[in-house]
C-alpha cells in the first residue's frame, strides 16, 4: 500500500522533484506488532534532513498519524517514508517549488535478516568509494546512486554486505548498514561528518553503549585498523543488529558485543 499526501495511490507526478532530481530524503522503519519501532527517532531524522536540505514542511503530526495508520495494517514488516520538495521550480532552482510531498509505503520484513542473525554476515570490500560532502553527510537523502553501484558490485560476490570506504580511504559504513567493531572493552564506529548515513540504529546503539561498561569512540580509521578488531557487527533499523563472521579473509569468532546489544535492540521501544 502507498499513501501519497494522505491518499491511497501509487503514481507520483513526473514533475515532482523526487523524480527530477532526487530532491528529498527518506527513512525506513521496522513495524513490530502494528507499531513503528523508534517512531520519534525516525520523525526527528526526517525533520533534520529537511532542515539541512531547506525543504519546508509543516505536516509532522499528520505524517506520524499516517505512519501509525499503515503500521497498524501491516502488523509486522517495513515502513518507508519519503519526503520530496514537491513540484515546481525552474531547473535546479527551488523558487516557487512545493508544497512538499510525503510518500509512505509498507512491505514485508526481509526474511534473510533472521538467517544472518543466526549465522553471521560476511562482508566484502567494495570497489566503490563514497564521495565526501559535509553538507549531505549523515542524512538519508534520495540520491542513492553510490549505494546502487555498491549493491551491484556486491551481488557479483558471495558476501552478504559490503564494507565501504570514502574517497580518502577511511572506513565509513556498509551498503545498507552502519558498522561497529570492538577491541577489548572499546567499541569503535566510523565518524560520519564527511560521508555516510547516520542510521537510527547506529544512534540507538551509541546511546546504549554510552550507558554500559564499554567505551564507544567515533573514529577515522583505515581498513587495517578495523580488521584488527576482536569483533565486528553491522546494524540498521530493520536488522537490527547482526554479527560479522568474516570480512574478506579475516574471520571474527567473538560475539560478546552482539550478545549485549541484540536483545536491547530487538524491541527498542
Give the location of each predicted region.
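ATP-grasp fold ATP-binding core
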Residues: 78-83
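Helix-start/capping segments and mature chain N-termini
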Residues: 1-68, 73, 84, 89, ...
Amino acid at each position: 500500500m502507498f499513501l501519497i499526501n494522505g491518499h491511497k495511490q501509487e503514481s507520483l507526478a513526473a514533475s515532482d522533484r523526487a523524480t527530477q532530481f532526487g530532491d528529498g530524503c527518506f527513512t525506513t522503519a521496522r513495524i513490530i506488532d502494528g507499531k513503528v519501532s523508534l517512531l520519534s527517532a525516525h520523525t526527528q531524522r526526517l525533520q533534520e534532513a529537511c532542515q539541512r536540505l531547506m525543504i519546508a514542511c509543516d505536516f509532522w503530526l499528520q505524517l506520524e498519524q499516517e505512519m501509525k495508520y499503515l503500521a497498524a495494517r501491516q502488523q509486522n514488516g517495513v515502513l518507508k517514508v519519503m519526503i520530496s520538495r514537491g513540484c515546481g521550480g525552474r531547473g535546479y532552482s527551488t523558487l516557487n517549488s512545493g508544497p512538499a510531498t510525503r510518500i509512505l509505503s509498507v512491505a514485508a520484513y526481509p526474511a534473510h535478516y533472521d538467517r544472518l542473525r543466526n549465522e553471521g554476515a560476511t562482508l566484502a570490500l567494495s570497489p566503490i568509494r563514497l564521495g565526501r560532502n559535509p553538507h549531505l553527510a549523515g542524512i538519508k537523502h534520495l540520491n542513492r546512486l553510490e549505494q546502487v553501484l555498491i549493491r551491484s558490485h556486491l551481488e557479483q560476490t558471495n558476501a552478504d554486505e559490503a564494507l565501504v570506504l570514502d574517497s580518502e580511504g577511511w572506513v565509513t559504513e556498509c551498503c545498507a548498514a552502519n558498522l561497529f567493531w570492538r577491541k577489548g572493552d572499546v567499541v569503535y564506529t566510523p565518524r560520519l561528518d564527511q560521508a555516510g548515513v547516520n542510521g537510527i540504529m547506529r544512534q540507538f546503539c551509541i546511546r546504549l553503549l554510552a550507558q554500559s561498561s564499554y567505551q564507544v569512540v567515533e573514529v577515522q580509521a583505515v581498513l587495517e585498523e578495523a580488521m584488527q578488531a576482536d569483533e565486528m557487527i553491522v546494524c540498521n533499523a530493520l536488522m537490527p543488529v547482526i554479527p560479522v563472521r568474516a570480512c574478506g579473509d579475516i574471520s571474527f569468532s567473538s560475539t560478546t558485543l552482539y550478545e549485549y546489544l541484540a536483545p536491547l535492540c530487538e524491541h527498542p521501544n
